[in-house]
Amino acid sequence: MTLTNYVQEVSLADFGKPLHHKAYWNKRLKTTGGRFFPKDGHLDFNPRMLEEHGELIFRKIVRHELCHYHLYFEGRGYHHKDRDFKDLLAQVNGLRYVPTSSKSKTNHHYSCQTCGQVYQRKRRINLAKYVCGNCHGKLMEKNQS
């Protein structure tokens, strides 16, 4: 079953309305479960949400995006702040927010050679330029095993 067919099935089962546009996987999405594009009507979904959280959570994410979709084409308020959107989302039991990822976001671990203070960073830092904030000691990168 393709993604578009799955979204069409959810639309008919949960909203009683057909989907007239396509749905696509978009692996560039990092912090969101999906996106609705009012300009051309297509939907994008994050494939990692299905992999990490399972089909039940993914179905709720699809419902969320379909709320945007159907309200937009009905000419009603389709933004998160609109009462129409909040009411429809509660009615179909969709997710308001995407669950956080279970993966750790810190990639680089540093420690001070003098006081032992540990620093975790997403981005790499220049060890020749930066020192410990506590004691001004030299930093070293910890091995990740």
Curated annotation (Swiss-Prot):
Entry keywords, A to Z: Cytoplasm, Metal-binding, Zinc
Localisation: Cytoplasm
InterPro entries tied to this protein: SprT-like_domain, Uncharacterised_SprT-like
Regions that span the bilayer: none
Family: Belongs to the SprT family.
Originating species: Streptococcus pyogenes serotype M1
One Gene Ontology cellular component annotation held by this UniProt entry: cytoplasm
Active site: 65
NCBIfam families in alphabetical order: PRK04351.1
GO terms for MF: zinc ion binding
Protein's name in the database: Protein SprT-like
